[in-house]
Amino acid sequence: MECALLLACAFPAAGSGPPRGLAGLGRVAKALQLCCLCCASVAAALASDSSSGASGLNDDYVFVTPVEVDSAGSYISHDILHNGRKKRSAQNARSSLHYRFSAFGQELHLELKPSAILSSHFIVQVLGKDGASETQKPEVQQCFYQGFIRNDSSSSVAVSTCAGLSGLIRTRKNEFLISPLPQLLAQEHNYSSPAGHHPHVLYKRTAEEKIQRYRGYPGSGRNYPGYSPSHIPHASQSRETEYHHRRLQKQHFCGRRKKYAPKPPTEDTYLRFDEYGSSGRPRRSAGKSQKGLNVETLVVADKKMVEKHGKGNVTTYILTVMNMVSGLFKDGTIGSDINVVVVSLILLEQEPGGLLINHHADQSLNSFCQWQSALIGKNGKRHDHAILLTGFDICSWKNEPCDTLGFAPISGMCSKYRSCTINEDTGLGLAFTIAHESGHNFGMIHDGEGNPCRKAEGNIMSPTLTGNNGVFSWSSCSRQYLKKFLSTPQAGCLVDEPKQAGQYKYPDKLPGQIYDADTQCKWQFGAKAKLCSLGFVKDICKSLWCHRVGHRCETKFMPAAEGTVCGLSMWCRQGQCVKFGELGPRPIHGQWSAWSKWSECSRTCGGGVKFQERHCNNPKPQYGGLFCPGSSRIYQLCNINPCNENSLDFRAQQCAEYNSKPFRGWFYQWKPYTKVEEEDRCKLYCKAENFEFFFAMSGKVKDGTPCSPNKNDVCIDGVCELVGCDHELGSKAVSDACGVCKGDNSTCKFYKGLYLNQHKANEYYPVVLIPAGARSIEIQELQVSSSYLAVRSLSQKYYLTGGWSIDWPGEFPFAGTTFEYQRSFNRPERLYAPGPTNETLVFEILMQGKNPGIAWKYALPKVMNGTPPATKRPAYTWSIVQSECSVSCGGGYINVKAICLRDQNTQVNSSFCSAKTKPVTEPKICNAFSCPAYWMPGEWSTCSKACAGGQQSRKIQCVQKKPFQKEEAVLHSLCPVSTPTQVQACNSHACPPQWSLGPWSQCSKTCGRGVRKRELLCKGSAAETLPESQCTSLPRPELQEGCVLGRCPKNSRLQWVASSWSECSATCGLGVRKREMKCSEKGFQGKLITFPERRCRNIKKPNLDLEETCNRRACPAHPVYNMVAGWYSLPWQQCTVTCGGGVQTRSVHCVQQGRPSSSCLLHQKPPVLRACNTNFCPAPEKREDPSCVDFFNWCHLVPQHGVCNHKFYGKQCCKSCTRKI
């Protein structure tokens, strides 16, 4: 007990932290030495060698000697090395193991049971140096255990017994790693153990780097296979600098990306069509599985890691680490039953083709993910997750060592292409890195990054390797991310039981041959990305440049995969673009895929376009192969029924879309402009209404737009395509003169004539009257003339060139058809319309000279047997149409109404249909299901500061709308994991300058009334000193004030003392003399010291006369000549004021021989005025109006902005404005 107490004193209590400084370490060392000395006599009495528990030199690691015990804790043996060598029977494999040892002042009893970390069909494959594959059946399957510590319900243990104990031990308060004691570490501490004992080192994560220094390889022991003492000193020496350099820096799980590297795409990650393909049967939801979820894991160790540990030891080491990972995923804080099962281990003695591994974690992971996606096991069986373990010191953003430990795609689990991680080997702590990176694959984000969990809580998903008192667990945020992932179909691969993968079949093609550069760009930048085709991109074998949006290409500075085509008959090999050569692939000619389904019609009426398309990807042309012959699209007209007469022209609709978009800073109303060259008919030209300019708003109109009015031809992909009268694309079928498609004019009767009459100029003259129903109308002058053709109705309404106003050439719609008016300087005028017209028209000529002759012709349908040809009578029927649902969820309605159709395709007025047959319609209920719950944020609170950065908060509420009800609050768990921001910064602008007051000085008097002062500075928001002129708008605080520290004690030596009399005011005759009463004290030398009168205010003044008459001598009776005249002054009068500066006056007379005289010299006259009481008057006390207060915390800013006169601000900020005044 004495030893245990000493040991407890040597180690700080939980949570107290390590000893600070060298002195602290020294105290611990001394205490430990003392402990060992005290315990020497009782060590033999402890069954499990308790002295080993005190053999460490600090609180991060101790030496222990485990012993095997039975379930009751009774000693069995010190020999714990046989457990991994004996082949166990099935019965033994199911039995439990017990070990016991002392550490950190307590007895630990481990109760262990076999772990299910390995699949029943687990195999090890070795890829040899010549590319050969070797399959091994490991003999270590029965030495991996998991369990707990007796008397600690929250503990967990995951260890390997293959060569001593190696693994993870987690207690309620701490987390330890255990492994056999390295010989060098024992030698350094001059530690030895009795024969047959097998000492181990139990250490915290903080000591991991130090422990690894003393190993030939991580996980090796003192006398175990693979241990080579001759190699250890060299290894220790070579890693000494590395340890000290990396001990503080190597703390990040996922590294930090340099600022110039691009951010990941914001859109959804690109997924190939077979990314989550099932194996033939539908998969259940992982989130609803009643059994545990199995992560069938492939582990790959690279060449550096195999060399580092040795081929004979690396398997045991890796499986020990994976057993620890399994234990971490079984921790109760994860909230789900996750079983990590290793189905296969691949050891790389050299890198296979297409797999590049170096310091650059991002590039290495990209290469590994591509490589492992092509691995296929027995019967096409695939693993769920692939883990790459590397001996490289990796870095997330450069091909040099740095502080990265692992790298992984977010939410990649179960994906064929993204369920993969890279992890740097750091010893047994590697288990935490693997658990962290696999957590990312499960969709987990770092704690504290976009979620409410704190970064430094000691959780597995913290950004850095810092535990909470050494304990790592899963945070509530990680649980939520995992729960969300398991509820998606993507997680379906985890539901099935582990199956035999067998030996993997390695791909016979390089990754770049399987996935071209466009696909690699999609993986990196999203579904819209493709290989950049800009000229500056030179070598994709060094950096793959991709194009996503706009005229900008971007890169993640990762090379294209091995085997990617980089030029004509060239491909990427080892970062170089080289010619195919003899080993290069043979040309593959492209073949078309199957035709797609028909697309939606581009128009709902008036003749739209739909298409089918196919792709030249079955296979794609590669390595100089030919592209597929023929077209990738076929088009067909659709919805050719005419639109309503009142509907807007299709081209006009497209122009109108730009009405709400600013054009060069202004908004216009746009109309179609069609007076363009023939080759520009399929561009969208629009004219600004009421302005004389037009503009090409788009390089091509929408598919199905007519090339020209009243023509069948339509625009498709910016090209005018021929359409026959039979409404077939590419058809040359035309209508005859009477409008019969593919007709021969046999149903037409033609009329024609010539008008040659001459008339007087500047008058309209009729040429021909053409009846309604006419077709193929053509009016043309025979020669060029100065006259003009005109058209009017029978009611004198002019459609063309009326009122002596000449119209420009162009198209003029009237009378049910469109007339094309042609006029040029070298060709005769011409009018043409296909018809039919719906009214009788009068064609005239506005005569301007000689009439050269006007030819006219038109056609009318023939009359059969006295009646025109029978026309089909239109049929009018009711049809039901319905709108879209009014809402997407929460219960809405579909409006249903009946419309009248002519011939089942044209909507007409309802009066054409029979009211008796009109169907009854009523709204339909739709989308009557609850909407997804969402976060409804409240209003932001008032900012906590008026300037210099404050905070404001708001409440959020999880609400949900149920069918036909108002939104109501629901449980927060129903809303998305990510919540809207609840706290935000506000009023970040700098505060205006303010007066800054220093502390008051000491009072100038220790008793009685004194004065104290303080310093005043003008300071800005950053506490910098500014000129006082910038603070003049603010009230200037007082710099001096009176102070009284206490009343002075009475001085018994003070007394009123009368001064000596003054001289008599007259030199002869009657005069006056005065004396003063002064507050005085007689000093030690007998001299009087005068004080202010207030010091004697408590002493009664003696009742003495202070003024009396005097008479030096009598004035002579007769004038005495030759006596000099002098000035005589009377006493000063009382001051006019008591403070602030007043005036005193007195009388001065010139006297000679006792009589007034004028003989005195004026420049000698004494002053008759003088200043008095010049001291400052005390400021009057202001009586503040109790109703004059500030209602807002920003009121002090109102005087600074000079708005106190404003009615609102002056009233609401009365106090601040009063101070300003």
Swiss-Prot record:
One of its GO terms (molecular function) is metal ion binding. The precursor is cleaved by a furin endopeptidase. Residues 293-498 form the Peptidase M12B domain. Gene3D superfamilies: 2.60.120.830, 3.40.1620.60, Collagenase (Catalytic Domain), Thrombospondin type-1 (TSP1) repeat. It holds the Pfam family PLAC. It comes from the Eukaryota. SMART domains: TSP1. Keywords: Cleavage on pair of basic residues, Disease variant, Disulfide bond, Extracellular matrix, Glycoprotein, Hydrolase, Metal-binding, Metalloprotease, Protease, Repeat, Secreted, Signal, Zinc, Zymogen. Residues 265-275 have a biased composition (Basic and acidic residues). Expressed in fetal lung, liver, and kidney and in adult brain, prostate, submaxillary gland, and endothelium. Residues 1-47 form the signal peptide. Its EC number is 3.4.24.-. Zn(2+) binds at C254, H436, H440, H446. Residues 258-291 are annotated as: Disordered. SUPFAM superfamilies: Metalloproteases ('zincins'), catalytic domain (SSF55486), TSP-1 type 1 repeat (SSF82895). Binds 1 zinc ion per subunit. It is found in: Secreted, Extracellular space, Extracellular matrix. Residues 750-876 are annotated as: Spacer. One of its GO terms (cellular component) is extracellular matrix. Residues 1184-1221 form the PLAC domain. This is A disintegrin and metalloproteinase with thrombospondin motifs 18.
